[in-house]
Amino acid sequence: PHMLAVASLRDEQETDSSQRLWVHGKGEDTKMADNSVDVVSLAFVIHECPETATDALMKEAFRILRPGGTFIMTDNNPQSAVIQKLPPALFTLMKSTEPHSNEYYTINVVNMLKANGFEHAHQEQTDPRHRTVLASKPL
């Protein structure tokens, strides 16, 4: 909630922030209207979730996106050479603070988006350790 307060304060200082809405709540149940937003953006969220929650987040994103709207997520890239080559002790230490990372590293996010009705789902490597996954809601 503190970051939302910072975002709201910064919005007050801008001339045109009327289109932004900062919300603290469950991503799986936003209470937003169907077809009401143009973009759903998740940054470093999915690796924190069990697979069932990831699927629920995608279903909710699809529901609230307007036709033609964009889903975008940035997170760790399980296929990244950097992550693949981590020493076992360091990888174990990293996973010890991330209880759902085993699930995250085995799910196919692109296929999950397609299964939830999204089209044009694809991923791009953002940097040596991270990826961005994009998809759109059909028109």
Regions found by a protein language model. Give the residues of each.
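Class I SAM-dependent methyltransferase SAM/SAH-binding core
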Residues: 1-29, 56
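Conserved Rossmann-like nucleotide-binding pocket used by diverse enzymes
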Residues: 23, 41, 72
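A short acidic, Gly/Pro-enriched loop at the edge of an enzyme's catalytic core
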Residues: 28-40
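A short SAM/SAH-binding and catalytic strip from SAM-dependent methyltransferases
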Residues: 38-52
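A short glycine-rich, Lys/Arg-flanked "PGG" loop and its adjoining helix->strand segment in the class I
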Residues: 55-67
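C-terminal alpha-helical "lid/dimerization" subdomain adjacent to the S-adenosyl-L-methionine
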Residues: 72-116, 120-126
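Short acidic/glycine-enriched loop/turn segments that link adjacent beta-strands
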Residues: 127-131
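C-terminal lobe and adjacent flexible extensions of AdoMet/dcAdoMet transferase-like proteins
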Residues: 133-139
